[in-house]
């Protein structure tokens, strides 16, 4: 897949959601929630500040992240794979 996001945008691939409940029951279809964990597959050059400088992003390709699904998150299919395009500010944490 060859795609390059602009500015402070990040492209992530969602991790599969857990398909079992806490009690061990296998969940089917719409009973499983979409995961808010993802792997970063591409990052932009950085955020352009008011003074014209570019602040590099804190995330890098390969990082495992937790993100907020909100208004600015865009779902796209690229090369047959579903990816999410979001701003770095939509990322809540990097899983270490």
UniProtKB/Swiss-Prot annotation:
<keyword id="KW-0963">Cytoplasm</keyword>
<dbReference type="InterPro" id="IPR018369">
    <property type="entry name" value="Chaprnonin_Cpn10_CS"/>
</dbReference>
<comment type="function">
    <text>Together with the chaperonin GroEL, plays an essential role in assisting protein folding. The GroEL-GroES system forms a nano-cage that allows encapsulation of the non-native substrate proteins and provides a physical environment optimized to promote and accelerate protein folding. GroES binds to the apical surface of the GroEL ring, thereby capping the opening of the GroEL channel.</text>
</comment>
<dbReference type="InterPro" id="IPR011032">
    <property type="entry name" value="GroES-like_sf"/>
</dbReference>
<dbReference type="Pfam" id="PF00166">
    <property type="entry name" value="Cpn10"/>
</dbReference>
<dbReference type="GO" id="GO:0051085">
    <property type="term" value="P:chaperone cofactor-dependent protein refolding"/>
</dbReference>
<protein>
    <recommendedName>
        <fullName>Co-chaperonin GroES</fullName>
    </recommendedName>
</protein>
<dbReference type="GO" id="GO:0044183">
    <property type="term" value="F:protein folding chaperone"/>
</dbReference>
<dbReference type="GO" id="GO:0051082">
    <property type="term" value="F:unfolded protein binding"/>
</dbReference>
<comment type="similarity">
    <text>Belongs to the GroES chaperonin family.</text>
</comment>
<dbReference type="GO" id="GO:0005524">
    <property type="term" value="F:ATP binding"/>
</dbReference>
<dbReference type="GO" id="GO:0046872">
    <property type="term" value="F:metal ion binding"/>
</dbReference>
<comment type="subunit">
    <text>Heptamer of 7 subunits arranged in a ring. Interacts with the chaperonin GroEL.</text>
</comment>
<dbReference type="InterPro" id="IPR020818">
    <property type="entry name" value="Chaperonin_GroES"/>
</dbReference>
<keyword id="KW-0143">Chaperone</keyword>
<dbReference type="InterPro" id="IPR037124">
    <property type="entry name" value="Chaperonin_GroES_sf"/>
</dbReference>
<dbReference type="GO" id="GO:0051087">
    <property type="term" value="F:protein-folding chaperone binding"/>
</dbReference>
<dbReference type="GO" id="GO:0005737">
    <property type="term" value="C:cytoplasm"/>
</dbReference>
